[in-house]
Amino acid sequence: MTELSITGQQVMPPPACTPPEPFRITTNAPHQMNDASLTPGRRKLQKWLGRVLRIVITDGRVLVGFFNCTDRDANIVLSMCAEYLVEGQEPRLLGNVMVPGQHIVSLSIDEPDPQSSLLVQ
């Protein structure tokens, strides 16, 4: 099916919108790594990837965003991060943020585990 543009030329309609793909985890780790070769701590971190974390830092600010990665110094990278200065105030949207491990006071998962919920039909 074609449509006419303002100039009278025939144009194809845009393709149907498709829902976004689910969160995809990428890694540069060797492919032979499997779940059995991971330490319990690394296994837990892997489960947290893509989840929403709430991090309180030393100056009292609260950062909430999607957990992307960490390193050996406990630095954490969050995407789509929001900063909360005072409870009840509007958050400030920051985007991608690297939180130094030395400034992290507490860290928590801010959403329920999607795999732990049961769907009833």
Curated annotation (Swiss-Prot):
Role noted for this protein: Auxiliary component of the N-terminal acetyltransferase C (NatC) complex which catalyzes acetylation of N-terminal methionine residues. May have an accessory function in the survival motor neuron (SMN) complex.
Sm domain span: 40-113
Keyword Cytoplasm among record annotations: yes
Subunit structure of this chain's protein: Component of the N-terminal acetyltransferase C (NatC) complex, which is composed of Naa35, Sbat/Naa38 and Naa30A. Interacts with Smn and Hez; along with Hez and Vlet, may form an accessory subcomplex involved in SMN complex function.
GO molecular function, one term: RNA binding
Additional free-text comment from the UniProt record: When it was originally identified as the potential ortholog of GEMIN7 this protein was named 'Sabbat' after the 7th day of the week.
UniProt subcellular location: Cytoplasm; Nucleus
SUPFAM superfamilies assigned: Sm-like ribonucleoproteins
Disulfide bonds: none
Protein family (similarity comment): Belongs to the snRNP Sm proteins family.
Pfam families: LSM
Any one GO cellular component localisation term in the record: NatC complex
Swiss-Prot/TrEMBL keywords: Cytoplasm, Nucleus
Predominant location: cytoplasm
Name this protein carries in UniProt: N-alpha-acetyltransferase 38, NatC auxiliary subunit
